[in-house]
Amino acid sequence: MFCVGLGGQDTSLSSSSPFLPCYVVKNPEFKLTNCCSMGVTTLVELQLHDAKKYVEATYHPVTSMSEAIQKLKVFTSTHDLDYVDGIMFSKTQGAIITGRMTDTISSGVTTQSFSDAKDPWFYLHVQDKIASITTPYTEAIPLAEYLFRYDRGGFWVGKSAFDYFKFPFNKLTRWWLDDFLHTRMLYTALHASGQSKKYVVQDLALPYSTAEEFVNYTDETFGIWPLWLCPLKQDSIPTMHPHSNEFEADGKTLKQMLNIGLWGFGPQNHADFIKANRNLEHKLRELGGMKWLYAHTYYSENEFWQMFDRKWYNNLREKYGATSLPSVYEKVKVDIEAETKAEGKKTLLGSLATMWPFSGLYGIRKAIASKTYLAARKAEWRTYGKKLE
């Protein structure tokens, strides 16, 4: 088995050059701006490095966001860890999770799996482990199961389905409904149901210096917990990814940023939902942060390009003959005016289709029809751990 490493190349199709090799080292600007606005990736070549059988994962309890940030800084400054992320369950409870690949499990360390329907969801398991301890707890997880540890439950978005239907949320119901609770099924149901227009799905990157203030804001405004924490290493190359201009003491190295995953129900009224998202974008901007562009984006075009180097981006589109393709802004923006008009023109039947529980039931129907649960059942990562026994 192998893990993906950095480097390699991909091949993209653009209007000026049928096949354009894009080496990470030689053409880094292409990799950092593409978003299918420069061309369409048709072939990917990856550099690999040897993987190990297990990840020894350690859960470090924290009691505040400031403590979480300090631990993230410490753990990302060392080179003997392979993985670092974190979960804040509330303002006073969280865990920073570190991982180290190994073929040999340390003495006294037990193994844990997350692939079977009877297994716990990862985030619930971590919360359970740190509930009664003040010191780090370590266990070994088969590598493939660690890499897909958030698949069952879709991080914690799956709990929202239980909340929506007012259905009991416990070990028995999670086991019974396991087919519906993998990321692909949840994603399909969310969008088919129309609930994505009422659900906040945002990854937001900020300087460490303003991350705690931002979390205080999201708590007061949305009340969404848990939050996912993921440290981000910056690159000096211009990019369409989140970035900031804060430097380390040497004046050359860009400081890391912190990605905060904010996923949960927002205001149910459409106008209030848009307003809440716009306010979120303004607060993010105020604190020197940026959002990842996979998510709903409500910026005006002028606001959007204030965050990025438009001239540099357009020059690249000219260079690669990609001006006939939609720009990044055109791909990610939400047409607020069109959505508002559509809301106002809904028929009685259309309104009923978006109401509880009909929209949710329709989402489930479409998710079942997609048969993505069959792919989840056959996923190789779910059997990897059993091969190690």
Segments from the language model and where they lie:
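Noncatalytic alpha-helical scaffold of FAD-dependent oxidoreductases
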Residues: 1-389
